[in-house]
């Protein structure tokens, strides 16, 4: 875990209630796939945990949903603002277990961690397939970014407005894959778990300190 001050480079709306914040700072080396950061926000006692969407030297990308007063305040932050950030939180994914054709599944707020994971797997010569699950067309985000990686990207919407009608498990049918990584709401993860032989799963959850000291 590291503590550093980052500067906002951009903070833009992607979909209703979904924003992408790009930060500039030095402590990005430990922002590996599946890990998260915590941001100290003005006038709020508890830091806000946000999963890492992308990270490279000197730049950190976070994609977040406005689910309360803290994230609603974040959505109003402008370029140039400086934020105190704790990086390197969480265990992250074990990429060595992926095999050649890993399957990456993200549902709603669980989509962002799959992006950095996909990039790192591709860099290792792997050929991931990505399934992104949403309720309806207007909620879709980051589809173009995944497709730009040159990998198979499947969209599933509960109402059938785009892609496969139904849930991510419906989109899994008939796919060949060696291992599974998934992030999203608990009902989705339970359904995926019941459909695969082996995998790693990240839960969306509220938390206090972010590193276990508060036992929350």
Give the role of each language-model region:
Residues 69-206:
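FNR/FR-type flavoprotein reductase catalytic core
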Residues 2-81:
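Ferredoxin-reductase
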Residues 209, 214:
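Short cysteine clusters
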């Amino acid at each position: 875990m590291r503590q550093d001050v980052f500067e906002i480079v951009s903070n833009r709306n992607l979909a209703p209630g979904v924003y992408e914040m790009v930060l500039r700072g030095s402590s990005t080396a430990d922002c590996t796939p599946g890990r998260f950061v915590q941001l100290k926000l003005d006038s709020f006692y508890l830091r806000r945990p946000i999963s890492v969407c992308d990270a490279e030297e000197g730049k950190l990308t976070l994609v977040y949903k406005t689910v309360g007063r803290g994230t609603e305040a974040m959505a109003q932050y402008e370029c140039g603002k400086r934020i105190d950030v704790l990086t390197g939180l969480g265990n992250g994914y074990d990429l060595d277990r992926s095999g050649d054709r890993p399957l990456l599944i993200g549902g709603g707020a669980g989509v962002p961690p799959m992006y950095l994971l996909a990039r790192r797997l591709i860099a290792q010569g792997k050929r991931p397939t990505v399934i992104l699950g949403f309720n309806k067309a207007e909620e879709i985000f980051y589809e173009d970014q995944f497709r730009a990686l040159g990998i198979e990207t499947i969209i599933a919407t509960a109402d059938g407005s785009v892609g496969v009608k139904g849930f991510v498990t419906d989109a899994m049918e008939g796919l060949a894959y060696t291992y599974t990584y998934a992030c999203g709401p608990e009902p989705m993860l339970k359904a995926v778990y019941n459909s695969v032989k082996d995998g790693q799963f990240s839960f969306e959850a509220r938390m206090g300190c972010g590193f276990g000291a508060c036992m929350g």
